[in-house]
Structure formats: structure tokens, C-alpha cells
Amino acid sequence: MAYAAAPDRRYRRRHVRYEGNEPPGTIVVDTSQRYLYAVEQGGWAMRYGIGVGEEGRTLKGKATIGRKAVWPSWTPTANMIRRKPHLQQYASGVPGGPHNPLGASALYLYRGGQDTMFRLHGTNEPWTIGQAVSSGCIRLTNEDIVDLYERTPLGTTVLVV
């Protein structure tokens, strides 16, 4: 049986000191450093390694978690299919499961009560953590998205920088 390559060790989940000014309960996504921080009390955060969108494709600024799903289905957007025609084969959707690009869980980013189409989600390609390869979503290993999912209520503020 072949196993997927694991992400680089520096992207493993860690409890770290956090120097930012965001209040506990906030999620901060640092796209340049490839880390997501779940801010906790007392100057601490849980830090996760992430994969980010290709240059210019990741949402920036504030959003909130407007929906959560376990083993979500995935359908590529029309824009994704235009950029990557091979995705046409998935235009009717891919059911949730281990071969789904959204992985084990997804946190849906909303602005003004509307779905932005950007997600924090797991991945079936864990070796891409630390890279800028997605169509704009923020990906974590399946183990990490499950951990983040469990500690993140609806309405959580997400700041993407």
C-alpha cells in the first residue's frame, strides 16, 4: 500500500506563543508564512501548517465561519474549470470521502452573510501543505482540520493576511 508523503515537519501542529493583538477565539491565517493560528487566552495559539492559493487567488481580510461540514462534497466552480479544463469531469460534484479535495472537514468563509466560496478545509494531498497551489482555499492536513473544526464555532472571525 502506498502512503501519501507527509508535509514538512515545520508545518506540524504546535501550541505556540502568539504576539498578535487579535482576541482569543479569532483565527489568523498568515498566507506568506503558511501558518494558521487559532488564538487562545494568555498569549497562546494553536498553530497549523497550511497550503494556500496560487498567487493572487486567496481571499484577504476578514470573514466569519458561516457553515461547517464533515466529509463535505465538492464541486469545482466555473472559473476553476475554465482555468483547469480537466476539472470538467467533476462538474456534477464529488461526494465526501477520502478522495475528495476538501478532505475530512470544511469551514466555510462568509462575508455579509454570503458564502465567499473560500474554505478552510482538509486535503487528499497532504504533501501540498506549505505550498501555494490551491485555487484560493486554505488547506490543512485532515488531522489538523478535524482538530480546528472541533474548536471553531459558527460565527468565528477569520483574518487572512
Show the residue positions of the predicted features.
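Cell wall/extracellular polymer interaction/catalysis modules
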Residues: 1-83, 96-98
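Exported/periplasmic cell-wall-interacting domains
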Residues: 22, 42, 47, 54-62, ...
